[in-house]
């Protein structure tokens, strides 16, 4: 059989191991020739092309994200802190409740003791009344020394006379006698007086208003306060002016206080406009 000589690769021969060979024992494999002798005029076949380069290996897959232990620790820490705060709040509430219960119990106990002592005193007083023992007299309250007198329209002479019975007058611990206030206890007193002057036509007469004191220890009247007015209105026109006096004095028993004015006809005796008074400090 004729073999083709234009085959690009060397021929391979297989040896049957079952056939006997005069050059080798049975079961021996003979080597295959690496090349076939070239005949004259025959070209050597070109070498096979090199194998293509292998592709680069794929990049390794990305690593999975690691857990964040600080966040877990922070969450655990905040949870523990919240629990601790809640515990302290509950503890404070329980302590406050306990203190409130203790105070309530203490108040109830004091109230019971007070009721018991009151009932005992009431029982003792009722027994004394039944036996006939007189109860102690009530303590006398000291009267406040005070006086407030208002103007009296029928006053026609000096010193001024005052209303001591009707209206907004007040007398306590002080006597009123013939236009004057009589002091019956030594001490510091605030003395005051107000006089309201008015007229239909102004003639600018000098006006005076004074408070004076009389006492058997002094040979003459002692002026305590005095007020004067000059050029107080426009000539020929209607006018009105007030004069107020007030000060603190050390008065003794049996002192008599009076009020005097220069023009009695110009005085308005309304109780809210003209008055005289004092009170002990």
Swiss-Prot record:
Residues 20-71, 118-142 are annotated as: Disordered. Pfam families: TNF. Residues 118-128 have a biased composition (Polar residues). Disulfide bonds join 202-233. Cytokine that binds to TNFRSF6/FAS, a receptor that transduces the apoptotic signal into cells. Involved in cytotoxic T-cell-mediated apoptosis, natural killer cell-mediated apoptosis and in T-cell development. Initiates fratricidal/suicidal activation-induced cell death (AICD) in antigen-activated T-cells contributing to the termination of immune responses. TNFRSF6/FAS-mediated apoptosis also has a role in the induction of peripheral tolerance. Binds to TNFRSF6B/DcR3, a decoy receptor that blocks apoptosis. It is linked to Autoimmune lymphoproliferative syndrome 1B: A disorder of apoptosis that manifests in early childhood and results in the accumulation of autoreactive lymphocytes. It is characterized by non-malignant lymphadenopathy with hepatosplenomegaly, and autoimmune hemolytic anemia, thrombocytopenia and neutropenia. This is Tumor necrosis factor ligand superfamily member 6. The gene is FASLG.
């Amino acid at each position: 059989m004729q073999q083709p000589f234009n085959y690009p690769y060397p021929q391979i021969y297989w040896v049957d191991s079952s056939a006997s060979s005069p050059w080798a024992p049975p079961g021996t494999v003979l080597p295959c020739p690496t090349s076939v002798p070239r005949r004259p005029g025959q070209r050597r076949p070109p070498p096979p092309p090199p194998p293509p380069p292998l592709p680069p290996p794929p990049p390794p897959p990305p690593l999975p994200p690691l857990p964040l232990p600080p966040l877990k620790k922070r969450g655990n820490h905040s949870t523990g802190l919240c629990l601790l705060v809640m515990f302290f709040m509950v503890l404070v509430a329980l302590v406050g409740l306990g203190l409130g219960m203790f105070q309530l119990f203490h108040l109830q106990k004091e109230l019971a003791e007070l009721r018991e002592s009151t009932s005992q005193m009431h029982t003792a007083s009722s027994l004394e009344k039944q036996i006939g023992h007189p109860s102690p007299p009530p303590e006398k309250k000291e009267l406040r020394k005070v006086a407030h007198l208002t103007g009296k329209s029928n006053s026609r002479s000096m010193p001024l006379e005052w209303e001591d019975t009707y209206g907004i007058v007040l007398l306590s611990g002080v006597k009123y006698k013939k236009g004057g206030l009589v002091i019956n206890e030594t001490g510091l007193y605030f003395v005051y007086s107000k006089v309201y002057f008015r007229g239909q036509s102004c003639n600018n007469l000098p006006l005076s208003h004074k408070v004076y004191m009389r006492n058997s220890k002094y040979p003459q009247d002692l002026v305590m306060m005095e007020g004067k007015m000059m050029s107080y209105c426009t000539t020929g026109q209607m006018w009105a002016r007030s004069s107020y006096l007030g000060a603190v004095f050390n008065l003794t028993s049996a002192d008599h206080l009076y009020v005097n004015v220069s023009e009695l006809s110009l005085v308005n005796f309304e109780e809210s406009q003209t008055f005289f008074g004092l009170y002990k400090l």
